[in-house]
């Protein structure tokens, strides 16, 4: 897959008020208009409907929705939950996505499943068990773990993946908690499917460096989920008064762990987990659209895979929750009316422009990163993406205040996109959360 890809996460329960596959299909043209390459579709499979609260995750209980159905605790890997629609609806949705020139990846939740899964009675050996025969329940998730030392289970899951690709039209998979499933299983499964579908897209919701060394295309790279993610780094800088140099530290830490594969990490500011956990403390609601745009400028130009949570493209301010649907919960779907506000229209224009720059820039796709020194390193993030053909300069004011910065190596710049940034003779004047992305004149081709 290309290094300049853009992923859009579509969570059915939050994407539309209806929360169905049919309703989502009607809005695929909208997603395509943003310049998205890959639609990441959250689980639509049959969920385990267990009313025993002791079997619910902590996040599920804290949601206050009292919804027994968790999209990440499944009962049937081949069936479509009636809440979302039918198998025909899935096929029609994937066809619509393909018609618009995009790929679609499905969520695989293989580490665990519900205790009422369709194979629970016929194949009890598929589950990991305690000595007394009870389900092995790992810390953190009160869900039964699956036993990947069982060859029949492996074949069952590989047949599931083949079905999702061949019958339902998936172009690949985002694999939930994939580090907790043996890597040799993923290696074998992907190799078998790629023999027929060599362009299969694979994403590990994990951090193991070995996983993106010839097995997965990309990974999340978030130790402890939140401790050292791109999101955590940017939130700390933008809202917790941490210095902008934290991004430099983030870069070096990832380079130490992943080497050149650090370019394979996803750069998300929100996803279904963080949006559900944050509720109304989301960056958009607390710190406003300018802070979000500052983070998205970096997320689209820094080495890695750009990632957009549904609703970010028009400043959504709704309380997203993966357990809230039309039957349970007080939280709403994303606020589509925001797309018609001045703020929402400006964000839509910004997203389309920054995505276009990302797609058409050789330096962003293939170039190395060079940090550019400035005289306010605690406030300003400044770097260049440099390829043989092109040099793209990026500078972002990460603080809610006006500043003037001087660059140690100022360039003659042709701005490609900017907001709240005025180029001076030897530096830049920034308004709060101002940014600039510019082509450095004389660096190669003169357009992006």
Q: Model-flagged regions — what are they?
A:
Residues 1-22, 29-37, 43-168, 188-197, ...:
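Substrate-binding/active-site clefts of carbohydrate-active enzymes
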Residues 2, 49, 259-412, 428-430, ...:
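Loop/helix patches that line or flank the sugar-binding groove of alpha-linked glycan CAZymes
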Residues 41-49, 107-117, 176-182, 205-209, ...:
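Short, solvent-exposed turn/loop segments enriched in Gly/Ser/Thr/Pro and often Arg
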Residues 25-37, 94-98, 251-258, 295-302:
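Short amphipathic alpha-helices and their capping/turn segments at secondary-structure boundaries
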Residues 6-8, 39-41, 104-106, 173, ...:
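Hydrophobic faces of well-ordered beta-strands that scaffold small-molecule active sites
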Residues 166, 176-261, 265, 315-353, ...:
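Active-site-proximal helices and loops of the catalytic beta/alpha 8
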Residues 424-448:
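C-terminal beta-strand-rich structural cap/linker in extracellular carbohydrate-active enzymes
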């Amino acid at each position: 897959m290309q290094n300049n890809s853009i992923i859009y996460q579509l969570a059915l329960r939050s994407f539309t008020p209806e929360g169905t596959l049919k309703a989502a299909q009607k809005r695929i043209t909208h997603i395509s208009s943003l310049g998205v390459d890959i639609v990441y579709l959250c689980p639509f499979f049959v969920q385990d409907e267990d009313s025993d609260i002791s079997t619910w995750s902590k996040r599920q209980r804290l949601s206050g929705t009292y919804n027994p159905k968790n999209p990440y605790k499944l009962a049937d890997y081949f069936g479509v939950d009636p809440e979302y629609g039918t198998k025909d609806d899935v096929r029609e949705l994937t066809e619509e996505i393909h018609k618009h020139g995009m790929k679609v990846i499905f969520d695989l939740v293989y580490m665990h499943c519900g205790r009422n899964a369709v194979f629970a009675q016929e194949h009890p050996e598929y589950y990991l068990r305690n000595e007394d025969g009870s389900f092995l329940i790992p810390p953190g998730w009160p869900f039964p773990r699956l036993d990947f030392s069982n060859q029949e289970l492996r074949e069952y899951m590989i047949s599931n993946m083949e079905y999702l690709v061949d019958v339902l039209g998936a172009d690949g998979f985002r694999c939930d908690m994939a580090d907790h499933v043996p890597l040799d299983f993923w290696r074998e499964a992907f190799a078998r499917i790629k023999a027929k579908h060599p362009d299969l897209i694979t994403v590990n919701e994990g951090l193991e460096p070995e996983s993106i060394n010839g097995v997965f295309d990309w990974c999340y790279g978030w130790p402890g989920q939140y401790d050292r993610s791109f999101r955590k780094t940017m939130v700390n800088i933008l809202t917790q008064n941490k210095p902008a140099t934290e991004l430099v530290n983030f870069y070096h830490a990832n380079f130490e762990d992943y080497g050149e594969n650090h370019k394979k990490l996803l750069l998300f500011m929100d996803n279904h987990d963080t949006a559900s956990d944050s509720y109304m403390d989301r960056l958009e609601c607390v710190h406003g659209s300018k802070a979000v745009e500052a983070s998205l400028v970096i997320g689209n130009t820094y080495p890695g895979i750009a990632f957009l949570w549904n609703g970010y493209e028009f400043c959504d301010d709704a309380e997203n929750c993966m357990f809230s649907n039309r039957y349970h919960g007080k939280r709403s779907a994303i606020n589509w009316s925001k797309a018609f506000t001045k703020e929402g229209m400006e964000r839509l224009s910004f997203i389309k422009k920054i995505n276009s720059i990302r797609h058409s820039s050789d330096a962003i796709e293939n170039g190395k990163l060079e940090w550019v020194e400035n005289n306010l390193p605690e406030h300003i993030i400044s770097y260049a993406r440099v390829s043989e053909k092109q040099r793209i300069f990026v500078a972002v004011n990460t603080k809610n205040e006006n500043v003037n910065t001087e660059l140690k190596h100022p360039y003659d710049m042709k701005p490609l996109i900017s907001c709240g940034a005025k180029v001076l003779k030897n530096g830049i004047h920034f308004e709060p959360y101002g940014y600039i992305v510019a082509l450095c004149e004389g660096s190669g081709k003169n357009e992006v």
